[in-house]
Amino acid sequence: KSTNGGTNWTCVGHWYGAGSTPYVHADHHHADFRPGTSELYVGTDGGVYKTTNSGSSWSDLNDGMNITQYYKISQSTSDTTVILAGAQDNGSHLRSSTINWSEVTGGDGMDNGVDAVNDNLMYTSVYYGDFYKSTNGGGFFSSINTLSVSGSGNWVTPFNTDPVTTNTVYAGFKKIWKSTNAGGSWSATSSNNISGNSNIDEFEVAPSNTNYIYTLINSNIYV
């Protein structure tokens, strides 16, 4: 904000709450004062926030509103209450028999997956193929930083857990990359890119025979 016509400015809202700056969700789209008052309303990718004291503090007006936009969703094969969902601009959310939709990783929630055998082993991601892993049922996630050789994927980079074998996961860039040790290391399933310089949009591993992988790139389907 500025209190002298724009000559000087002070940050009064920050996504990460830098220092003593109060939290306001990122990606702002609109701001407006309530007529005849000092109440300022700000519209963001995380909903509506309000200040009544010139930005010294903000109120989140979105509590209790069960709304968001999910990019991707996955479910445990053994426990249907275990669900992961990646929400645009609002992180990745986990639901289970003991957790009622908790945000487990932040940023832009993208693709995700739960291990075929071990429900404590789960994965989330953010944009361009930045993946995270939890080994304790979503209590803590750490970055999987072993995929740097694959380059940059799509904004929503596709990801799948193997439908049969534990610790086995796949990620789609220009090639399909596979890990058999829960993301500890990766290898490409092919020597060449599937379709030139085009990234993979989506792919699925057949549960009847995991050697069969169907890949979608632009308007084409590859197997």
Residue ranges and their predicted role:
Residues 1-223:
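Beta-propeller blade termini and top-face loops
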